[in-house]
Amino acid sequence: MSNNKKLTSLFGAPVSDRENSMTAGPRGPLLMQDWYFLEQMAHFDREVIPERRMHAKGSGAFGTFTVTNDITQYTSASIFSEVGKQTEMFARFSTVAGERGAADAERDIRGFALKFYTDEGNWDLVGNNTPVFFFRDPKLFASLNHAIKRDPRTNMRSAQNNWDFWTSLPEALHQVTILMTDRGIPKGFRNMHGFGSHTYSMYNDKGERVWVKFHHRTQQGIENLQPDEAARTIAEDRESSQRDLFEAIENKDYPKWKTYIQVMTEEQARNHKDNPFDLTKVWYKGDYPLIEVGEWELNRNPDNYFQDVEQAAFAPTNIVPGIDFSPDRMLQGRLFSYGDAQRYRLGVNHWQIPVNQPKGVGIENICPFSRDGQMRILDNNQGGSTHYYPNSEGAFEDQPEFKKPGLKVEGEAYEYDFREDDDNYFEQPGRLFRLQSKEQQERIFENTANEMQGTTLEVQHRHIRHCYKADSEYGKGVAKALGIDINDVDLEVKD
């Protein structure tokens, strides 16, 4: 007698034959009453959910975050309340531009999203493996997506579209420079740093606020691929980073990262030379040193990729008391776009999917005002309890003890041009370039020339001009690699 599980329909009815359809005679047409065939095909036709518009190709794992340093002077967040405290977490790493089937070893930014299941609710910290971004206003989000993805006519990735967009934004040079360095192709997800990128805020139990940036430093060491190595890797294994992460965890070689913050007081922010909320710039560590916070380890692979990785939903609106937002325009834009994208992709009740549930609080303790919606399957839809406020039963009482400290804002509502406030586009990419060794600088030139193949002379001149303004040797090196005489480039044009 077989101990194998017996095949049933989705609703539990036994299936008598899984291979042969019901027909009118041995060679006749199929019958519509073959309900199992209909059920199978109808489900198959709907298996694929919308992929993420960005960060479509990803890998993830569960782990544990441990506090290693007391930062309660900055934040009242329970997750950081005492040294040694541990919190369950989930991490998802990804490429950005490629679709769900893209190769892992492409030159691209890597997504770096963390979900902490704290005892005050889920905290999502979304970021990348770079500390900056291409621009600083979210109105350009959709255009970036269009420029780096497939051309509407050819349906092919277009270097011209990509570089035309990047070079039309002088503030993009910092991110582009990072992307053209050796770190543009990490060997794997385990061998790269991560950044919250945005400026966030923290406040303590006295209501005192500071601005912070998050850093996650790999304990496996930084390792990258050169273009020829990446090409071989892609030819041999398109899932190289995913395989490396999965197999390391399966073999109990658990990857670890240390988390740090940079802290800027409100007074320092008011006197900062640049806009401290500008996502195209970093805070220099010499001025704002790294402060250790904790360490996290990924130690459990998902049992099912679709359930835990594909359906993982991150949104920077998922914060906890003691952590808050900032005037960073890009962060403000993401506060809407991330949650909205997840509601489109997974439905309004995606918070009930296991990987997204507030495990640290317990689903039974969730008391949301929201009801109904597709796939409301847990919490009995709050049963027959009161579903409005105010009410006479005291349901949905506020928790005023968790009010945030006030944030002073001023000014007229207007579409302010960032460039009129700050046109210091080139200082930081120039400084980054000079931090590279001569060999690393040469690779930046070579990588740039390779990536710019297929672009117009106008776009190439524009990029050379930006590089030259960051550092003359940077501009000369890129020009030489592209086979362009630097004297033929108008270096004084203001883009």
Swiss-Prot record:
PROSITE patterns given in the database record: CATALASE_1 (PS00437), CATALASE_2 (PS00438), CATALASE_3 (PS51402)
Region of interest: Disordered: 1-25
SMART domains per the UniProt record, alphabetical: Catalase (SM01060)
Reaction it catalyzes: 2 H2O2 = O2 + 2 H2O
Keywords: Heme, Hydrogen peroxide, Iron, Metal-binding, Oxidoreductase, Peroxidase
GO biological process, one term: response to hydrogen peroxide
Record bears the keyword Oxidoreductase: yes
GO molecular function: catalase activity; heme binding; metal ion binding
Binding site for heme: 338
Cofactors, names only: heme
Quaternary state and interactors: Homodimer.
Job of this protein: Decomposes hydrogen peroxide into water and oxygen; serves to protect cells from the toxic effects of hydrogen peroxide.
Stated name of the protein: Catalase
Organism: Staphylococcus saprophyticus subsp. saprophyticus (strain ATCC 15305 / DSM 20229 / NCIMB 8711 / NCTC 7292 / S-41)
Lineage: Bacteria, Bacillati, Bacillota, Bacilli, Bacillales
Name of the gene encoding the protein in the UniProt record: katA
